[in-house]
Amino acid sequence: MYICKRKTKNDMKRILSLAFAIVLLATLPMQGQGKRYQVAGVAFYNLENLFDTIPNNPLGRDAEYTPNGARKWTGKRYWNKIHNLAYAISNMKTDLTPMGPAIIGVSEVENITVMQDLARDEQLKAWNLQVIHHDSPDRRGIDVGFLFNPRLFRPLNVTHHTLVVESNPNFRTRDQSCVSGLLLGEPVSVIVNHWPSRLGGQKQSSYLREAAAALSKHIADSVLAINPKQKIIIMGDLNDDPMDPSCAEVLGAKRNVKDVEEGGWYNPWWDVLASGVGTLAYRGQWNLFDQIIINYNLVGKDRSTLKYFKCKVHNDIPGIRTEEGDRTGYPLRTFASGVYLNGYSDHFPTQIFLTRELK
């Protein structure tokens, strides 16, 4: 929701001054080359069951996240969760992006209210994050969402897309949200996802994630049909790794930039996982489900427009890891085995950095 008011002459002067300061903040010297670049961070974070305390799911699927429910989800626990997540997000700023990520896609949020509460936390208040949210048909009552810094990204169009699986017509999952706008003034589209889980087995449920990947590709193709030069990002908790069929075959996201052809996709997380780094772990096995995949228009050596620079798993935020026991090094969750841990999420956040040379 946007609230607009008439701008005075002094307001416009302040806005222009702020815009100039933002350009300075978003630039850095490339060591040894004498060049300066603007940098934009684009991030994703699975917030793991960010429910409020009010029972409002028609099917009662949020009952455990109420004060009298199984999780004893009191106001105190809710606000602890908000504060912890805001702390993690505030630590996603880097030397390259002192204002934090321009865009943060999220998953497992119950409604727009929890996103607004997160954006208003004191640790994020200075960023003035704005919220885009859509209630989807997922039976658990969780959705994807979109946070953005309005000084760095301006949304122009938002669409939401429901996954329909012909062989399983009663299946319901999270809708995919496509947000198109201007990132540092350049047209960019971001498709935020939370693909179906591996419930029932990885292989047995793979067809659902492959269908979700096909929907993401269809959305992207529709955008490219209007503007073949559009920069597109597919992000989310994909519940698959980079080498799984949904990503590697249906999307066709490549491990090596040199293999990405026009109209194709690059997946920088393939090598990250191969190095032993993931975003979530189960029984000693790391996975990298939280991926940010980019299209052909975001790769290449031409730095006159925004291009991919590097990626990062934010597993080094102080306090975000489990420090003891058989889950040492894992993301510190809110609950584990039914025990309240006052943690963050069962996933680490991820981020890519896009750069553009300043002339």
What is the predicted role of each segment?
Residues 33-34, 222-232, 240-359:
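Metal-dependent phosphoester-hydrolase catalytic domains
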Residues 48, 110, 196, 238-241, ...:
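Catalytic metal-binding/acid-base residues of hydrolase active sites
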